[in-house]
Amino acid sequence: MQICVTGVVLRSRPLGKNHTLTTLFTPEGLFTFFAKQGQTLQCDYRETLVPISLGKYTLHRNGSRLPKLTHGDILNAFEAIKQTYALLEASGKMIQALLASQWKEKPSHKLFSLFLNFLHRIPESSNPEFFAAIFVLKLLQYEGILDLTPACSLCKASLPYACYRYQGHKLCKKHQHKQAISIEKEEEQILQAIIHAKQFSELLAIAEFPIAIAEKIFYLFDSLQEEKKSERNSSEDPYHEILRLSKVVHPY
């Protein structure tokens, strides 16, 4: 049976000496397929397998076996992202967040649209790491696991701004988790501004703020993924795959 899938390549893992397993993020969720000779020049569609590429893929599906690539077309290679390591690294963090949080063929139309828009807009940001962190915060919001109320998640004491955060929880000093991080008043205001932003122009403007909060956002996300960390393989780092497959040279 022939099927057509449109999506963004999140990773392409080597399979044997020559083949690849490629994972897409699509409006219908994560989708993985087999590409014969995908690591070699014999594959006519090799460029469509490079991470951070939007493509349209024709696949042959045979029962429970992995779908096999029969044709691929590049719709957007996002070349601007692949020209600088800072943009590659930031985009890689968005990719890692999707791989860690999304499920196989779990419909995610709004999240796919959001991710695609972030890929289009991230080259416009002078602070791509913070812009990627904004996407991760939006991902937590999309999943409905981020406490946005002005109160402690446990005792409901009023916490208009300064607080502690751990995983999706917002906590007062009395109920802070031992691994919670302190969120200062200005930082919480920035988090709330990100959550309530409706336009990308607002998000780009927020990313210009001289405030070091990106690492805290990544920590909040990672604290939700602790049980999955042992399953991750550091050799599958998406932006290192890009460097390998597209021959981008590290500028430093």
From Swiss-Prot:
Pfam family, one: RecO_C
InterPro entries, alphabetized: ARFGAP/RecO, DNA_rep/recomb_RecO_N, NA-bd_OB-fold, RecO, RecO_C
Keywords: DNA damage, DNA recombination, DNA repair
GO CC, alphabetical: bacterial nucleoid
GO biological process terms held by the UniProt record: DNA recombination; double-strand break repair
Similarity-based family: Belongs to the RecO family.
Main function: Involved in DNA repair and RecF pathway recombination.
Protein name per the record: DNA repair protein RecO
